């Protein structure tokens, strides 16, 4: 009977750890060998609230940016992120990157990491951003 109780306790403990790990992985995870984090929009919003000095990069075109963007974002098109060009921010700054759907932001985050930026996070596309946007 003691063995059955011990087995049940171990299984319950293991399930609790697995649930906590799954929740942690769904909010942020390091992309292996990519040098940047992938965040949910909710985790990105929390980071922006906790660090008002974080740089929010919209890597879409200027026209897309003008059509609506996240408040506080800076338009820095993915095509303009080139290794031979200087960056307009420090490489150790917290940088959060987004685009329309997530493809360009992942590419931009990878390029920024390759250029030596050490605190880059990609949270995908504005189409998944459930919070306020602006055209200002």
Residue ranges and their predicted role:
Residues 2-50, 54, 63-94, 100-136:
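Rhodanese-like catalytic fold shared by cysteine-dependent sulfurtransferases
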């Amino acid at each position: 009977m003691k063995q059955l109780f011990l087995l049940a306790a171990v299984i319950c403990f293991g399930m609790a750890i697995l649930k906590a790990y799954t929740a942690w992985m769904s909010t942020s995870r390091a992309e292996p060998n990519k040098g940047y984090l992938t965040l949910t929009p909710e985790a990105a919003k929390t980071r922006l609230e906790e660090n008002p000095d974080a740089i929010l990069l919209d890597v879409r075109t200027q026209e897309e940016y003008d059509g609506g963007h996240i408040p506080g974002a800076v338009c820095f098109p993915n095509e303009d992120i080139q290794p031979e060009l200087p960056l307009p921010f420090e490489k150790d700054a917290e940088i959060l990157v987004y685009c329309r759907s997530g493809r360009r932001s992942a590419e931009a985050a990878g390029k920024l990491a390759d250029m030596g930026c050490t605190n880059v996070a990609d949270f995908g596309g504005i189409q998944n951003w459930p919070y306020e946007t602006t055209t200002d």
